[in-house]
Amino acid sequence: MSNPMFPEKWEESSTSKSSRRVHKRRERKMWKKPIKLSRFPSFGFSGSDFTLDQIPAIFSGYTAESEDSSSSEMSDDSRTYSKSSDENEELDQERPRSVKRRAKSKSISRISSMKVLRRQSTRTLYGAGQRLKKMRSMKRLTSNSRQILRKKNLDRGDFGLLQPHYLRPTSSSASKNVENNQKNLGAARLKRIASLRYNGLLKATCSSAMKGSSSKRSNDVCTYRYCSLHGRRHSHAADNNAGVPSLKRFVSMRRKFMNRQKSVNRRLVLLKRTLSRKRGPLGGRVVTDQESKEVDDNVDGDSDEEVFEEEVSSSVDGGNDNESIGRSSETVMVDVDDNVDRGMDAMETVASKVQESKTETVGATLWRAICEQTVTGHDHDDGKVDGTTSDGTVGDNEEVCREGSSGELREEDGKKTEYVWNETVTLVKQAFDEILAEITDDDSSDDISMTKDEALEVGLGEEDVGADSSDSSCSDMQPVIERDTHLSVIASTFHMRDEFGHQRGPKKWSYLKRVILLKRFLKSLDRKERRKLSDGKESETIMRLRRELVGERKNAEEWMLDHALRQVISTLAPSQKKKVKHLVKAFESLIPMDGGSRGHDDLVSPAREENETVNSQTQTILRDNKDATDILEVSPAKDLEETNLTCEASSFLSIDMKSDEENETVNSPTIWRDNEDTTDLLEVVPAKDLEETNLTSESSSSLCIGMKSDEALESTADASLCNHLAVEEEVDGLALGSFIEEEEKKGESEKQNLSTWRNLIQKHMVMRDNSEGNRNETEQEHKWSYGTDQMTGIDDANAAAVKSIQLAFETILSEIPDSSSDEESVSESSNSLKEEKEHQGETKRSWNSLRKVILLKRFVKSLEKVQVPNPRKMRNLPVESAFEAENVFLRHRSIMEGTRTEGEEMMLDYALRQAISRLAPIQRKKVDLLVQAFDIVLDGHDTPKQTKNSDTPRNNDETKEGKPRVEEGCEVNKDEQKIKNVFARFQVHQKDLKGEEEVHNTPKESRNLPPIRNFKQRIVVEKGKDSRMWKLIYKHMVTEKEGIDSANAESVASVESEYDDEAGGLQIDARRSGTVTLVREALEKILSEIPDNSSDDQSMDSDITTEQELFERNSQVSEEKSEVSSATFKPKFTEKRVKGWNNVKKVILLKRFVSDLGSLTRLSPKTPRVLPWEPDPETEKIRLRHQEIGGKRNSEEWMLDYALRQAISTLAPSQKRKVSLLAQAFDTISLQDMGSGSTPGSAASSRNISRQSSISSMAAHYENEANAEIIRGKLRNLQEDLKESAKLDGVSKDLEEKQQCSSLWRILCKQMEDNEKNQTLPEETRKEEEEEELKEDTSVDGEKMELYQTEAVELLGEVIDGISLEESQDQNLNNEETRQKSETLQVSKVRIDRWSNLKRAILLRRFVKALENVRKFNPREPRFLPPNPEVEAEKVNLRHQETQNKKNGDEWMVDNALQGVVSKLTPARKLKVQLLVQAFESLSATGN
C-alpha cells in the first residue's frame, strides 16, 4: 500500500522495519534464552492508531509538572512531561546531540520486561473518551532508524501534524472491533497488575514515553536506573556514593518479587516468627498496594528511590561474613525510601538483630577450639602430631562443606573457599598479634604499676580504646569501658580484699588482666566487617538461600576455627610461642568449670561441711547466670563483667570453703565438662596448679565477702554485687531443675563410655605378653566365623583399624613424658612432712591433671574413628559355576543394634590387641600411665602413692616367664588402703549373685541381649561366661589324672550317635583336628609359664629354667605336691603354699587358659550339607532334628570335651606332670560350678573358696601392679569375712540347682525303688502293670513306640554301662591307693572322701546330661504322603496337646526306658545301680 502524502518516507520506514525484523531474528539465534521486550509505542504511523485530537496532546502533555495527576492514575507513566508546546522547538537542537551521544555508545542492551510490566492497552488523557492504543514495542535502534525518526518529526512539525487517511477507520464495524479488543485487553491486564503493584519495581522506564519527547531537561529529570531512550545508565548525584544495580539484577529482582507475591514466602514468615519471639519484629517487610500508593504520591521526582536485596546471615558463631558460605541464610527485603544513608541504617539494624540473636551460643565452641590449639601449639615437638591429626579433620570438614552446598553453587563455592580460608587466617592472626602484644613475660611490672582503683579504671579505659581503634573493620563496636558498668565494683572488692591480705595484690592484678586480655581476644575473633551493599561484580551476584543441617553447619564452623588457629600457631615466632604459654595459663585459670557435685563428695575435705549453704547459694548463682540449654558457654558478645562473674563463681564453686588463712593452699577437685564434644566425657580434674588455685581462691573470696565477715557488709560495692547476683538468681531460678536432670543423665552416659575404653585398654595391657598367640587365635576365629570368601575384606578392614589405632597411640604417647620425672617428684613429695610441701610437690609434676584430661579426650576421639571401617564385604558369585552342588555356608546374623555394637567392640578388641602387641617396652610403660589416667578420671582420685620399691608398672606381677616380682619395703597402711580400694570396686551384692546364676543358665551365644550398663553386672556376666569353661577344663584334668579314658570314649560315642549323616561326620572330623590344634597351642602356652616347684621353694630370682631341670624337679617333688594338694584345708601346709605357687598366680594362669579356650566356643559345629552325587530314586526320608538352645550348648561342650581329651592324651610325660600341677591348682581354687559336687556340709566352704578365686581373679586382672604376697595374705582375712554371707548364698544356690535336676533325680530314685519292689513281685503282676501303663496313652502307635523304646533303652544302657565301669574303676583305684598308703591313713581318707564326692558330682552331671539327651528324643516319626493318593478325601486327625501333657509324655518316655533297662540288669550291675542311688540320695533333697 502506497502512501500518497509521504511516499519516500514510507518506503524508508518499510525498509527499516524489514531490517529490524532480520536483525531481531539474528539476535534470537544468538541468545540462548530470549528475553521478551516490553511493548512500547513506536512512531510509525501505520493503521488507525491515533486520532487527530490525541496527537497534539501526546507531545504537549509530557512535562515534569503534570506528573502528579498522571502518576496517581497510572502506575507505569513516565514522570517527564512539558507544560506547553513551546519546548518542542528545542527538540531540533537537542536531537543532533543525542544522536551523536548514542552513536558513541558501543553497546545498547535490551530491556527484558516481565508480563507484569506490559503496558495497559488504553489510558485516559484529560478525559475518559479519548483512547490511545499502544503500538508494537520499539526494536533495537540503529543510526539509520534514528535519522528516519528525526526526519519524520521534522515533517510533522512543518505540516502541523495532519491526520493521514490510514489512521481513520474505514467502517463502523472496524472501529467497534478495535474498541472491544482494547477493552478486553485492558481488563485482563488490569486484573493481573492489580495485586502485583510495587513502587520500586513497577515503575515505567523512559521508553514508556514517546521517543520524541526528550528535551534538555529530560536527562536531569529522568529518575530511572536504565533508560532505553538515552541508551545508558543514569548516574545522579545520589548514586555516586552507591553503585547502580544493573539491568540483569533489576530483572531478577522483579522476577523474584512476582514469585513471592503469588505464594507467600515461607522463609520470611519463619524468620519473622523466630526472630519476633526473641528479638522483636523484623526490619524487612513486604510492601502492600496501599503503601506503594502512598510512596508514589510522596515522590518528588528525585532519583532517591532504591531497592536493595540484602542477605543477612545468621550463622551460629556470628563471626566472619565469609564463614557464612555453606550455611543457611535468610533474605530480607528492605525498602529505602528517600535517603541512601537511611537505607544503610535500616540494613545495619536488621543485620545487628540477626547477629545478636546468635552470639549466645558462640562461647563453648570458641573456648574449646582456642584451648586445644594453644595447648598443642606452644609445644615444639607437637607440630608433626597436629599435622597428622588435622589432615583427617580437614578432609572430613571439607566433605561436609561440599555436601552442604547446593548443586547450582558448587563451582562458585569452590572458587571462594580459598579466599575464605585466607581471610579467616588473617583475622585470627590479627587477633593473636593484638593479644600477644600486650602479654609480657614479666607480669611484675604491670602488677606494680596498678595498685589503686583509679589506676585500674584509667588503664582499662586506655586499653579498651586502643583495642577498638586498632581495628578499622570493627568500628561499630562500642568501647568495653562503657559496657562494663560493674567493673569498678569488682575492682573495689579486690581493693577491699587487700586489707585482709596485702601479699596477693600482684596475683590479683595479673588475674584481672588475663580476664581483660582474653575478653579482647574473643571479641577480635568475633568481629565482623560492615557489608558493602553494592561493589562491582559482587553487587550483580544474586544471593540464594541454602538449606543445611545444624550438625553440618556446626562442624563447618569448628573446622574453620580449627584450621585458622592451627595455621596461625604454626607460623608464630619462638618468642611469641612463649607468650602463648601465658595465654594457656590464662585459659587454665579461666576455663568454664562445672562445680556441680555428682557423686564426688568423697573428695571434699571435712571443712566444707561448715559452708554447705554458701556452696549451694553460689551454685545456684552460677547456673542461673546462663541459659538453661548451654550454661557452661562464655559468650564473647556479653559484657566483660558478666564473664568475670561467671568465671569467678565457677572457680569459687569448686574450692573448699575454708578460713581466710587456709585459702592459699587449697587443692580442689573441679569438673570440666565439654558440651560440644560428641563423646561427652565426664572428667574429674584435680586442680594442682598452685598459682591457679591461689587466683581462684582470691576471686572466690572476693565474691563471698558479704557472706563471711560483718565488716565487708558495710561496703556499698559488695552490697550492689550481692543484689545483682540475687536478682539473677530469682529471674533464672526456674531453669535450674531441668538442667540438673540433664546433666545427671549426661554424666552417667559419659562415665559409661569412658569406662568401656578403660576396660579395653586394661584388658589388652594385662594380656599383651601372649599377644602373638592371641593373634593366631583371632585369625583362626575370623576364618571359622566369616568363611574363606570374606577373609580378604576382613584383613583389609583389620589393617585399617590397626593403623588408625597405631596413629592414635603415637599421638597420645608422644605427649606423655617419661615416668622418671614423675617418680622423682613422687619420692620428693613422700619424703616431705608438711602438707603444704606435699601440695607444692604435686603442682610441680610435669604431667598434671589437666594435661591428662586433654590427652584422654584426644585419644578417645581418635579411637572413635576406628569404628568407621565396615568389616563386611560384598559376596560375589563365582565366574564359572561348577556342575556340582555349591557348598554355601549361610551365616545368618541379626540386624539388632546390640549385634552391631558387639561387632564394633570385637573389631576394636582385635585392633587394640594387635596395636599393644607391637609396642616397644618403653611405650608399654607409657601405656601404663595411660591406664592410670583412666583410673583417675573414672574413680575421681589417685591410687595410693607407691614408694621407690613399688613404683613398677601395673603388669609387673607377671613377666614373660611367669615370675612375679617380690616387692619389699611397703608400708602397711598404704597396702591396706590399696587392698581396700581393689576389693571395694568389685564387691558383688546379693542381687548381683542371683543375676550371676541366671547368667550361668542362659545360652552361651547371647548376642541379642541388651548391653549391660552397670559395671558390676558386666563383671557378673563375665564370670558366668567363664564358669562353664572352668568346669570343662577341671573335668578333663581330673579324668586325665585318674586315667578314665574308656568311659569318656563311650560317652563321646553316645553323643556321636546323634550325627547320623556320613558326609557331616567327615567334615566334623576335619573340624575336630583344627580345634585340637588350637587347644594344644593354648595348653603349650599355659604350661610353659608354670614354674618348677623347687625353684619356688628356694627363691624367685632366676627367670628362665630349662625343661630338663623342670622335669627332674617335678619328678622329685610330685609326691610331695600330691600330699600338699590333698590336705589343702590343714594349716600345716599353708606356709609351704605361701612360699611356692600362690593362689594369685594360679588365678592368673587359669584365667588366661580360659580366655584362650573361650574363643573356641564360637566355632559352629554345623557343617555345609552336600548333596549326593546320584540321588536315590526312592522317596527321600528326611529326619529333621530340632536342636534347642541347650542342645546347641551341649554340642559345643562336647566339641571342647573331645578336643581336650585328644590334646591331653597326646602330651608328653613331662607335660603330663605339669598337667597334674594344673589339676592341683583346680583343687586349691575351687570353682563356683563345682559347689554342687560337695556334700551339704562342705558346700559353704567350697562356696567361700570359689568366691575367693573369683574376686582374686578380677583383682589381678585390673590391678596387676599390686603385690602378690600382700593380696594373698589379705585374701585369708577376706575369706573369714565372707563365710557368713556365703552360707546364705550357698543355700540359695543349692536350692536352684536342685530344682533344675529334681525332676530327673526323682525319676531315677523312683526307678531304683521300683526295681527293688519288682524283684519280690511275681512276673505276672509286673506284666499287668506295664500293660495298664501302656494303655493310658492312646495317642501313640504301638509299632512305632516299640522302635523308639528300643533305641532309648540302648542309649540309656550305654550311659549306665559307662557310669558303672567308671565307678568300679574308681573303687579299684581307691582301694589300691589305700593299700599303698596305709601309713598315712588320715590323709588318704580325707583325699578319698573328697575325690569320691567330686567324682560323684561329675558322674551325676554326665548322667543328667545323657538323660536330657534322651528327653529330647522325639517319639514322632515324619509322616510321608502315599505314592498313590486315594480318591477319597483325606482325613486328618489333629491332636492338640498342651504343654503339661507334652512334659508328662517326655517323663513317661524316660520312665518306661528306665524300667526296661533296670529290669534287664544283671545282679552285679544292680549292685552298682544301688551305689548310684546312694549318690543321688546324698546330693538330692528328694532322697531325704
Swiss-Prot record:
Q: Name one GO biological process term.
A: defense response
List where Basic residues composition bias occurs.
18-31, 98-107
Q: Where is the composition biased (Low complexity)?
A: 1235-1252
Q: Which controlled-vocabulary keywords does the entry list?
A: Calmodulin-binding, Plant defense
Q: Does the keyword Cell inner membrane apply?
A: no
User: What induces this one?
Assistant: Induced by infection with the bacterial pathogen Pseudomonas syringae pv tomato strain DC3000 carrying the avirulent factor avrRpm1.
Q: Basic and acidic residues composition bias: which ranges? A: 76-86, 833-844, 954-971, 1316-1328
A Pfam match is CaM_binding
Enumerate the InterPro entries for this protein.
CaM-bd_dom_pln, PICBP-like
Record keywords: Aminoacyl-tRNA synthetase included? no
Q: Where is the composition biased (Acidic residues)?
A: 297-312
**Sequence segments annotated as region (Disordered):** 1-31, 63-112, 280-329, 378-414, 816-844, 941-971, 1232-1252, 1316-1340
The ranges of region (Calmodulin-binding) come to: 493-592, 831-938, 1135-1229, 1379-1483
General function of this protein: Binds calmodulin in a calcium-dependent manner in vitro. May play a role in general plant defense including R gene-mediated responses.
For this entry, the protein name equals: Calmodulin binding protein PICBP
